[in-house]
Regions:
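Low-complexity, Ser/Thr/Pro/Gly-enriched N-terminal "stalk/linker" regions
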Residues: 1-21
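Acidic/His metal-coordination segments adjacent to aromatic residues that form catalytic metal sites
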Residues: 5-10, 70-88, 150-184, 247-252
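Aromatic-rich carbohydrate-recognition surfaces in CAZymes
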Residues: 16-44, 48-151
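Inter-helical turn/loop segments and adjacent helix faces that build the functional surface
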Residues: 33-38, 104-117, 179, 183, ...
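A conserved active-site cap/scaffold subdomain adjacent to cofactor or substrate pockets
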Residues: 187-203, 224, 263
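Acidic, glycine-rich loop-and-beta core segments that form the ion-binding/anion-interacting portion
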Residues: 207-251
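Active-site loop ensemble at the mouth of alpha/beta enzyme cores that anchors a bound cofactor
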Residues: 247-265
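Conserved small/polar residues in nucleotide/adenosyl-binding loops
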Residues: 269-271
Length: 271
C-alpha cells in the first residue's frame, strides 16, 4: 500500500526492476479474473497505480527500481535518476500501461484509478509522443552507453538515425530493448494509435476531459494517416506491405522482431 492505495511492484524475473512493458504483459491474463478474486483485483490496481507513478517520474524511461536505489546503468549518458533502472525510450513503454488500465476498467468498472496521478501521466504521455514527432526540433531525449554492443546505444550524438518529421513518433529502442535502425518503429506507432484512443475514451467517460480526449484522438488520427502514407512498401512479390521501420525519407527496413508489438503480433494487442 502507498498512501492508503494499492501499490504493486512487478519485477521482470531475472532483474529486480520493473519494466512498464513487462509488468503490463505479465499481469494481463489475470484481468479477466479480477471480479472473481478481491486480492487479485487489488494486485492489478496496484500495478496500474505504480505504472502511473513511474511514468510521472520519467516518461522516457523503460524500467524502474523499487525506490531511489540507483542501479547498473547510472553511468549512461542520459538524464538518469536513482529511481530509474534504465532509460531507453520505447513507445510501447507508454502504451502497455494504457492498455492495462483500460481493460481493467472495462472488466471491473473500477474508475478510481483514473485520479490525479492518472491525469498527470496521460498529460506526460501526450507531451512525450508529440516531442518525439520531432516537428519542433529533436526534443530533449538523448541516450548513449559505453558498450561494445551497438544495439545498446544510439549514434548521432545520442539522437539516433535522422528522421524526417511526417507525423510518426520516434522510438529510439524496440520492445527488445535493442536500438532501432530507422526510428519510426511501425508496430509501436500502431500501438500508440490504439492506446491513445483508449485513453480518449477514459478521459471522456470518466474524467469529462473532452479537450484532452480530443488531443488524444487528433494525435491518433495523425499517426494513423502517416502510417498509411509513409510506412508501406510495394513488395515485388507480395504487393503493399507494412515495413518494420521507416525514417520518413523513403527508407524502409523489411523485417519483424520476436517481441510484442511486432507486425505479426498486432492482433494480440487488439489492433
Amino acid at each position: 500500500m502507498l498512501d492508503g492505495k494499492p501499490d504493486t511492484f512487478v519485477y521482470t524475473g531475472d532483474i529486480h526492476a520493473m519494466w512498464l512493458r513487462d509488468s503490463g504483459a505479465q499481469v494481463w491474463p489475470y484481468v479477466q479474473l479480477a471480479n472473481n478474486d478481491a486480492q487479485l483485483k487489488e494486485m492489478l490496481e496496484g500495478v496500474i497505480r505504480r505504472q502511473f507513478l513511474c511514468i510521472n517520474i520519467d516518461p522516457y524511461a523503460n524500467a524502474f527500481n523499487d525506490g531511489p536505489t540507483g542501479g547498473n546503468w547510472m553511468t549512461d549518458l542520459t538524464d538518469m535518476k536513482p529511481e530509474l533502472h534504465e532509460r531507453k525510450w520505447e513507445i510501447d513503454s507508454l502504451c502497455y500501461p494504457l492498455r492495462l488500465a483500460y481493460q481493467y476498467w472495462k472488466v471491473t468498472g473500477d474508475s478510481s484509478i483514473f485520479d490525479g496521478e492518472w491525469m498527470k501521466a496521460i498529460t506526460a504521455i501526450l507531451k512525450t509522443f508529440k516531442e518525439q514527432q520531432r516537428k519542433d526540433g529533436v526534443g530533449p531525449y538523448r541516450f548513449q552507453r559505453k558498450t561494445e554492443r551497438a544495439l545498446d546505444t544510439l549514434n548521432n550524438d545520442g539522437l539516433g538515425a535522422p528522421v524526417k518529421p511526417v507525423g510518426l513518433i520516434v522510438s529510439a529502442f524496440r520492445p527488445s530493448d535493442d536500438a532501432t535502425t530507422l526510428q519510426y518503429l511501425v508496430p509501436s506507432n500502431f500501438f500508440a494509435v490504439s492506446s491513445l484512443r483508449k485513453a480518449a475514451e477514459i478521459l471522456t467517460e470518466v474524467n469529462k476531459e473532452t479537450s484532452l480526449a480530443k488531443e488524444c484522438t487528433d494525435l491518433a488520427a495523425e499517426v494513423e494517416a502517416a502510417l498509411k502514407k509513409y510506412a508501406t512498401y510495394n513488395h515485388p512479390e507480395f504487393g503493399t506491405i507494412y515495413a518494420f521501420e521507416v525514417d520518413g525519407f523513403g527508407n524502409h527496413l523489411l523485417m519483424d522482431d520476436a517481441n510484442v508489438p511486432s507486425l505479426l503480433a498486432l492482433s494480440l494487442i487488439h489492433i
